[in-house]
Amino acid sequence: MKVFDSSAVLAVIFQEPGADVAAALMSQDNALISSVNLAEVVGRLLDEGLSNAEAAGACEQLPLRVVPLSRAQATAAGQLKPGTRTRGLSLGDRCCLALAQEHPSAVVVTSDRPWTGLAGFDIKLIR
């Protein structure tokens, strides 16, 4: 199972370095994204000048299963803050990790180097 951070999804959409790695992982079965991270993707697409319809269409094309943020994930994301504060992880980042915690064999796919070495997580950097 792969859990995608918004940075890896945006790399695919914008064909940034690492897009090939992220796209290959995304095309495998059981690729997930938290609804919070999808919201980050949509926001970035709008920042880049896409219309609401274009941003929604781009997200619909992604072979990812969107997982709504649950109460348990929200709590877990909050509990991750003390251990990730020094790495500069955002709320969205912690929601991604909280989703991954629910799937013990999950690989977290990101382009964010500060995630490397986070205890208890299998992190795959795309670049």
Language model: regions and residue ranges:
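Acidic, PIN/NYN-like endoribonuclease modules and their adjacent C-terminal/linker elements
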Residues: M1, L97-R127
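Short, well-structured N-terminal submotif of metal-dependent ribonuclease cores
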Residues: M1-I33, L45-G57
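Histidine- and aromatic-rich ligand-binding microenvironments
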Residues: K2-D5, I33-S35, L89-L91, D112, ...
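Alpha-helix capping/helix-boundary segments
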Residues: A8-V9, N37, Q73, C95-C96, ...
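A general structural signal for well-ordered alpha-helical segments in protein cores
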Residues: A19, L38, N52, A74-A77, ...
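Short, structured coil segments at secondary-structure junctions
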Residues: S27, L62, A119-F121
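Active-site neighborhoods of divalent-metal-dependent phosphate/nucleic-acid chemistry enzymes
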Residues: R65-V107
